[in-house]
């Protein structure tokens, strides 16, 4: 077996125990408290969210600057990105969308009735809205970048160097991905900030952090190729910006929970989780699965069958985790 595959599965062995701790460790506490509002505002829950804020920042920042000091396996990044995409997709559909739909049904069901009225799929509609809003943000960023490139050409940019033009295109894609992921990360962080229980917060933490670790490593490698003059300064700057985006979202989510009560908190939770579902689906499908990580040299695992197995493994992991969530 290639070294990249060994490294990849070793990483998974280290991550899965963290998943078990996050999902099962606080389950008894969740069942002991039947009053959602008190758990939502409890000091222990807020402490967990603050811990998540710090953890996601530190791990993302370290991952972002790591390519400057370490030489990551190309195969590991190819499979890791696909695995993260499977985790993101399964989390959005099996966890976020399910919880949002259940909350909407509870809010819209009158006392003494068994079915909501009206029986409109609000969670699914808002998930579509989150997907489209994220796509719109990507389109705006792409338009701004393409306009900048056209302006440079009109100012007399040398068109004879085709290799340089190809390089600039790949650089533009990398910058677009970085900016878009920073935008997405704010909303991903909100998913942690508005978590109803400590186990939900830990679960959202490991899911988002797993994705951000691979994204940060890939971002760091792209920056080393793009800006060779000051690679360390660039890595630190961009890694800090990317790492701080999710904690900002966590802080926003904590403020939302701390300033709302009763059904208002439930409405905000349902709305935010529905929109976050759309964001997660877009990021997983468009950025992680469709584009993925493009190695600068041929690697053995950069083939459809290996990518499919990595995505399948990510989905299966979430499917197993959801056994303890139901």
Swiss-Prot record:
It is found in: Cell membrane. The keyword Endoplasmic reticulum does not apply. Residues 1-20 form the signal peptide. The gene is ZIP11. One of its GO terms (molecular function) is metal ion transmembrane transporter activity. The chain crosses the membrane at residues 50-70, 76-96, 122-142, 175-195, 204-224, 236-256, 263-283, 306-326. InterPro entries: ZIP. Belongs to the ZIP transporter (TC 2.A.5) family. Residues 21-49, 97-121, 196-203, 257-262 are extracellular. Coiled coil: none annotated. Residues 71-75, 143-174, 225-235, 284-305 are cytoplasmic. It holds the Pfam family Zip. One of its GO terms (biological process) is zinc ion transport. Its main location: membrane. Keywords: Cell membrane, Ion transport, Membrane, Signal, Transmembrane, Transmembrane helix, Transport, Zinc, Zinc transport. This is Zinc transporter 11. The keyword RNA-binding does not apply. GO terms for cellular component: nucleus; plasma membrane. Probably mediates zinc uptake from the rhizosphere. It is a multi-pass membrane protein. It comes from the Eukaryota.
């Amino acid at each position: 077996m290639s070294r990249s595959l060994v490294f990849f599965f070793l990483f998974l062995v280290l991550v899965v125990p963290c998943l078990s701790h996050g999902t099962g460790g606080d389950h008894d506490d969740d069942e002991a408290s039947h009053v959602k509002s008190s758990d939502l505002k409890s000091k222990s829950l807020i402490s967990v969210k603050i811990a998540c804020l710090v953890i996601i920042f530190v791990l993302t920042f370290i991952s972002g600057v790591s390519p400057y000091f370490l030489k990551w396996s190309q195969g590991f990044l190819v499979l890791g990105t696909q695995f993260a995409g499977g985790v993101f997709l399964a989390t959005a559909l099996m966890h976020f969308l399910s919880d949002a739909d259940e909350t909407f049904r509870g809010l819209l069901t009158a006392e003494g009735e068994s079915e909501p009225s009206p029986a409109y799929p609000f969670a699914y509609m808002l998930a579509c809205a989150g997907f489209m809003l994220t796509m719109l943000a990507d389109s705006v960023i792409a338009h701004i970048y393409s306009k900048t490139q056209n302006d440079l050409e009109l100012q007399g940019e040398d068109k004879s160097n085709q290799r340089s033009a190809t390089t600039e295109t790949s650089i533009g894609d990398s910058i677009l991905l970085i900016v878009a992921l920073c935008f997405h990360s704010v909303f991903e962080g909100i998913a942690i900030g508005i978590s109803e229980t400590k186990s939900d917060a830990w679960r959202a933490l490991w899911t988002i952090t797993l994705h951000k670790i691979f994204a940060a490593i890939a971002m760091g490698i792209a920056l080393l190729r793009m800006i060779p003059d000051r690679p360390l300064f660039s890595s630190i700057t961009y890694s800090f910006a990317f790492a701080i985006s999710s904690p900002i979202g966590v802080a926003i989510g904590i403020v939302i929970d701390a300033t709302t009560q009763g059904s208002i908190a439930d409405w905000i939770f349902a709305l935010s989780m529905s929109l976050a579902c759309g964001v997660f689906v877009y990021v997983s499908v468009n950025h992680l699965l469709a584009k993925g990580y493009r190695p600068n040299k041929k690697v053995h695992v950069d083939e459809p069958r290996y990518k499919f197995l990595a995505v399948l493994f990510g989905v299966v992991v979430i499917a197993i985790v959801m056994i303890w969530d139901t």
